[in-house]
Amino acid sequence: MKNTCLLVALALSIGCNRSTSSTATAGKPTVALVLKTLNHPFFVDMRRGAQEAADRLGVTLQVQAAEREIDVEKQMQIVENMIQTGIQALAITPSGSREIVSALVKARDAKVPIIVVDTRLDPKAAADAGVRAATFVGSDNYEGGKLAGDYLVKATGGKARVGILEGIPGHETGDSRLRGFRDAVKGSAGVAIVASQPANWERDQGFNVFQNMLQAHPDIDSVFACSDLMALGAIEAIAAARKTGTIRVIGFDALDDAKKAIAAGTMEASVAQFPSEMGRAAVESAVKVMHGERIPEDIKVKLELVTKDNVK
């Protein structure tokens, strides 16, 4: 009986050791990448860049995301669960600039460095909670919106009736793009923003919202969408109204489908970000912080306006 108990205990001990070794991936440090969603090409590209960097730097990358980009509560749960697994660093694209801060308090308490990617934290909420990110990795969304607005003014000769598809109200990324666009066009007396409504980053909502917008304002001749998915939805609404070729569409992200639309002439332009570069820089920054290296508070990723003249 004693021998049997000893054998069982030994087997359990070996099993536990194997489990720990497997979880730690042979002692490699683990970086968690928590994305808004993986049902969007932008974040799929970001994951790809992050994985390439993780493979090159010899760290384990754990990637999780909510089903929908607007599901802040699910993202908060993911963050809390990731921290409990003993990660060494956390890179996150916040679904809610304010809401996510309460989950990041747990990362702070666990001394897990935080790398914020693409969407900034609300500065007041973060300061009030004592949450400080090691760095922000992303493009300047305000400048991107301004780039789109400047293009519209030039392309229309300063005369346009514009409908805007916003992201999620109160969401830093969309708000900054919207502010940049508005600032770019406000000096042109001939440019009028006749409607501006949220479509929550989704293609279906882009279609529905712009279809209703077009019915209410049939004189709209230009649309700025704060993301390409919403822009692609607007293009479908334009086609349904048999107005293809009469309304300029400007998007943001330069997704592959948007580039195809630009080449086909159904979209005028899109502001390109480089999500794979963001993912790469996020993992590189996380590894540097884990090694005690100092990194800049902001790591900027370039922007580029894609039109029919340079689309690839």
Regions found by a protein language model. Name each.
Residues 5-15:
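Bacterial N-terminal signal peptides
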Residues 16-312:
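A residue-level marker of the well-folded mature domains of exported/periplasmic proteins
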Residues 1-4, 50:
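Positively charged n-region of N-terminal signal peptides that target proteins for export
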